[in-house]
Amino acid sequence: MKKQPIVLLLGKLPPPFMGPAIATEILLRSALRDRFRLVHLDTRAHRSLTSMGNWSIRKAFRTLSIYLRMKWLLLRHRPDVVIIPISQSTLGFFKDSLYLWIAKAFFRKVIFHLRGSNFRTWYAASGTINKAYVRWVLRRIQGVIVQGEKLRPIFEGLV
């Protein structure tokens, strides 16, 4: 029997029940399990909708612990590919790009997963330094998953 490729899938899980968390849950329960060995890293740093978007020491430590857990999962499972959902805001993209750098430190292939359609608009409105960083990051990934064919042009000229 052929060994299943190992995929480290990053993403939030409910609660709170919201689009990205539900999408991650659906992926983890999908037929992908028949073709890949899915390993999941819950990237949720908040426990409720009221704490979303608010900074706290507790959330900073939780985020740091998520990065450390990712390192442990990379060492333990040695995934063939890491799938990272990306944000469409400057701070969110920077935070998400740290997952890329951790994966690349372990010589893993990385695929970004965009859940939304605002990336190109955000990128176009970004400053020169931010655009340069985004291009630098996107040159280091193996691809991007979007939610439909019509969204593929979002990354035209970037990936």
Where are these regions (language model features)?
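Helix N-cap/beta->alpha junction signal
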Residues: 20, 116, 148-150
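An aromatic- and histidine-rich active-site surface loop
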Residues: 66, 81-106
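N-terminal subdomain of nucleotide-sugar transferases
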Residues: 1-47, 107
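N-terminal beta-loop-helix "entrance" segment that forms/cooperates
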Residues: 44-62
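A short, histidine- and acid-enriched strand-loop-helix "catalytic/donor-clamping" loop
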Residues: 87-91, 106-128, 142-143
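A short beta-strand/loop micro-motif in the catalytic core of glycosyltransferases
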Residues: 137-149
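Helix-loop-beta element that forms the nucleotide-linked donor phosphate-binding surface
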Residues: 152-159
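Glycine-rich, highly charged phosphate/nucleotide-binding loops
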Residues: 57-74
